[in-house]
């Protein structure tokens, strides 16, 4: 078994724990690689074991950080590599264990005492081309001018679903339903469901409400106000300005995100984290 280790770059405790994980796995006889950014912020790792995330070819990536660190790993890795998330963030919806459980969790992984949790992702096409990363959480179409609304139409499988004047439109996976989409009034969606949430962001019309559609749906978003640019955000990690006439299409990605899990229960973990957030 070969491991990758990635740490949150702005937290010394995460970097130090990453080195302890690295050392533990090396001493246990496993091949271990570390991503370049982790090494850049803590140079104690062997330089021979340092690789860009894009070149990781391992069995499991141990990510020490929060959801943002996991999303960064997801966007940069080329393969569907299972992730073991150790929470060094705020809430850590995507992480599996707390720091004090790290080495017990690693021992269970080594013994094969775990299962893989697969999550759907969204793929975005801009004028028919896939030029942006797949989204684990959400794709957001946002106003390009703060304080100015945008006028959008969105279609489900070719049929007009709604026309909204709002700050934006969020298209979310079940995984992302506890994030930006929930802040926009969207529902909590059990991550085991195969659906997509569409949530207008601060719409003018009270009739513009969140929708839940099958993940097999094709979602087309069109900018009605052709004089106003929009911003496309993917998981809050990738941003790009789009010209007003850009045709945006969102579908379920053929790729999935895989997580190492030790417990098959969703509740009460998710609901407790949602409540602690507010």
Curated annotation (Swiss-Prot):
Keywords for the protein's UniProt record, in alphabetical order = ATP-binding, Cytoplasm, Kinase, NAD, NADP, Nucleotide-binding, Transferase
Tell me where on the tree of life, at the top rank, the source sits: Archaea
Positions annotated as active site in the UniProt record: 67 (proton acceptor)
Mind listing the GO biological process terms from this record? NAD metabolic process; NADP biosynthetic process
According to the UniProt entry, what is the EC number of this protein?
2.7.1.23
Positions with a binding annotation for NAD(+): 67-68, 72, 137-138, 148, 165, 167, 178-183, 202, 237
| Needed cofactors | a divalent metal cation
- UniProt subcellular location: Cytoplasm
Provide one Gene Ontology cellular component: cytoplasm
Q: Name the Pfam families for this protein.
A: NAD_kinase, NAD_kinase_C
The protein's GO terms of the molecular function aspect are: ATP binding; metal ion binding; NAD+ kinase activity
Which reaction does this enzyme catalyse, per its entry?
NAD(+) + ATP = ADP + NADP(+) + H(+)
**What Gene3D superfamilies does its record include?**
Probable inorganic polyphosphate/atp-NAD kinase, domain 1, Probable inorganic polyphosphate/atp-NAD kinase, domain 2
Which NCBIfam families does this one have? PRK03708.1 (NF002984)
**Task performed by this protein:** Involved in the regulation of the intracellular balance of NAD and NADP, and is a key enzyme in the biosynthesis of NADP. Catalyzes specifically the phosphorylation on 2'-hydroxyl of the adenosine moiety of NAD to yield NADP.
Q: Which family does it belong to?
A: Belongs to the NAD kinase family.
Name of the protein this chain belongs to = NAD kinase
Which gene produces this protein?
nadK
């Amino acid at each position: 078994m070969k491991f990758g280790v990635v740490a949150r770059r702005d937290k010394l405790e995460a970097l130090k724990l990453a080195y302890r994980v690295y050392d533990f796995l090396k001493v246990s006889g496993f091949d271990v690689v570390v991503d370049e950014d982790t090494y850049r912020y803590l140079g104690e790792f062997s330089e021979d074991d340092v690789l860009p995330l894009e070149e990781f070819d391992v069995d499991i990536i141990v990510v020490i950080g929060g959801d943002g660190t996991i999303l960064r790993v997801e966007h940069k890795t080329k393969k569907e590599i299972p992730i073991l998330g150790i929470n060094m963030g705020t809430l850590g919806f995507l992480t599996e264990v707390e720091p004090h459980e790290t080495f017990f969790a690693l021992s269970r992984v080594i013994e094969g005492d775990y299962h893989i949790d697969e999550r759907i992702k969204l793929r975005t096409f801009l004028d028919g081309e896939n030029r942006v990363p797949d989204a684990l959480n959400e794709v957001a179409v946002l106003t390009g001018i703060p304080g100015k609304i945008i006028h959008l139409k969105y279609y489900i499988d070719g049929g007009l679903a709604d026309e909204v004047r709002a700050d934006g439109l969020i298209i979310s996976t079940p995984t992302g339903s506890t994030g930006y989409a929930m802040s926009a009034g969207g529902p909590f969606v059990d991550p085991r469901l195969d659906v997509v949430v569409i949530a207008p962001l601060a719409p003018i019309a009270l009739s513009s409400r969140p929708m839940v559609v099958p993940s097999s749906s094709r979602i087309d978003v069109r900018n009605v106000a052709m004089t106003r640019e929009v911003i496309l955000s993917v998981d809050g990690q990738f941003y790009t300005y789009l010209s007003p006439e850009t045709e945006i299409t969102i579908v379920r990605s053929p790729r999935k995100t895989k997580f190492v899990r030790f417990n098959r229960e969703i509740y009460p973990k998710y609901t407790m984290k949602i409540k602690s957030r507010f």
